[in-house]
Amino acid sequence: MAKQVLVELGERSYPIEIGQNLFSSSEPLARYLQNKNILIVTNETIAPLYLQQIEAMLSDFACVKPVILPDGEQYKTLEQMNTIFTSLLEQNLGRDTVLIALGGGVIGDMTGFAAASYQRGVDFIQIPTTLLSQVDSSVGGKTAVNHPLGKNMIGAFYQPKCVLIDTHCLSTLPKREFAAGMAEVIKYGVIWDAEFFQWLENNVEALKSLDTQALEYAISRCCEIKAEVVEKDETEQAVRALLNLGHTFGHAIEAEMGYGVWLHGEAVSAGTVLAAITSNKLGLVDESIVCRITALLAAFDLPTTAPDTMDFEQFIKHMRRDKKVLKGQLRLILPEGIGQAGIYSDVTDELLEEVISCA
């Protein structure tokens, strides 16, 4: 039986359905698809695995020709967005259209942004197939594409009608992609829930072996935390920024190394360690906290150091373009212990250079 987490945003509230074998029935989605045209957006990797199954599930509804995009962060661009818009226009689809994002974070972000933009807004549904998208990017309404000068710089806040998470999809996920998703899972423990962090420490092998109960609990807990945060601060004016732990450093790594060279979760992992080291140098946490965070990330074979080829100047030029920068001042999300974090705008360049040089 599927577990449901509700994101409560008044008229824009929506359910997250979490379970196994959810692609066998259209029941969770039926209410959003009646009298609608349905355009599925997916990629070349996911289409052979799940597209036929989803089309069969939706056979009672009006599905049109799907959009199949190339796979990878490097294709999260306005050019590929235009492929979605062209398909919508060529098939004469109007505001009675529902877009379905079938894939990972890139597909979800692009489909959501297309839905927010097309004819000033059409409905969309998230069917995330990677761990990272299931626990993070499919929930909360952040949609965007990248720009050569910065990640997720062009986008909108736009909530889905429903999120359908089938944990069975993780059985086809490459190990590297699974590990990248665990960086976001661990983030929730660091910023919000010390008990969950400890549970993760105690269940590394169960998660790595794709134990069904462990996966469903971890995904559900992450979605519960994400829903709680989004309900308090939908457009990231305050507490939602905490979800960006590791991302200011991480986005700099992605932009400098080239999108897709480091997976997003890998960059967030290294960025989380850099944030923890910064906290330690500011006296916010002792070294044992840095060690626990680093050890848990390393247990999932994630990188815990910055790329050897990046120096301070390369980091800082990208970090200064971060969306959290306010009045020219860099704001970092830093752990204050296990289970809590804060926003800090008084970190000097000298300290950051010290952190980056020793990481």
UniProtKB/Swiss-Prot annotation:
Q: Which reaction does it catalyse?
A: 7-phospho-2-dehydro-3-deoxy-D-arabino-heptonate = 3-dehydroquinate + phosphate
Q: What does this protein do?
A: Catalyzes the conversion of 3-deoxy-D-arabino-heptulosonate 7-phosphate (DAHP) to dehydroquinate (DHQ).
- Identify the taxonomic lineage of the organism of origin: Bacteria, Pseudomonadati, Pseudomonadota, Gammaproteobacteria, Alteromonadales
- Give the source species: Shewanella pealeana (strain ATCC 700345 / ANG-SQ1)
Please report which protein family the annotation says this sequence is part of: Belongs to the sugar phosphate cyclases superfamily. Dehydroquinate synthase family.
Query: What is the first-listed, main subcellular location in coarse terms?
Result: cytoplasm
Enumerate the CDD domains for this protein: DHQS (cd08195)
Positions bound to Zn(2+): 184, 247, 264
User: What are its E.C. numbers?
Assistant: 4.2.3.4
Positions contributing to NAD(+) binding: 71-76, 105-109, 129-130, 142, 151, 169-172
Note on cofactor:
Binds 1 divalent metal cation per subunit. Can use either Co(2+) or Zn(2+).
Q: Which biological process annotations from GO are given for this protein?
A: amino acid biosynthetic process; aromatic amino acid family biosynthetic process; chorismate biosynthetic process
What pathway is this protein said to act in by its record?
Answer: Metabolic intermediate biosynthesis; chorismate biosynthesis; chorismate from D-erythrose 4-phosphate and phosphoenolpyruvate: step 2/7
Entry-linked SUPFAM superfamilies:
Dehydroquinate synthase-like (SSF56796)
| Keyword set includes Cytoplasm | yes
Q: Which GO terms describe its cellular component?
A: cytoplasm
Name the UniProt record assigns to this protein:
3-dehydroquinate synthase
GO molecular function annotation: 3-dehydroquinate synthase activity; metal ion binding; nucleotide binding
Annotated localization:
Cytoplasm
What are the names of the required cofactors? Co(2+); Zn(2+); NAD(+)
UniProt xrefs under InterPro entries: Dehydroquinate_synthase (IPR050071), DHQ_synth_AroB (IPR016037), DHQ_synth_fam (IPR030963), DHQS/DOIS_N (IPR030960), DHQS_C (IPR056179)
Superkingdom, taxonomy of origin: Bacteria
What keywords is this UniProt entry annotated with? Amino-acid biosynthesis, Aromatic amino acid biosynthesis, Cobalt, Cytoplasm, Lyase, Metal-binding, NAD, Nucleotide-binding, Zinc
NAD found in the keyword field: yes
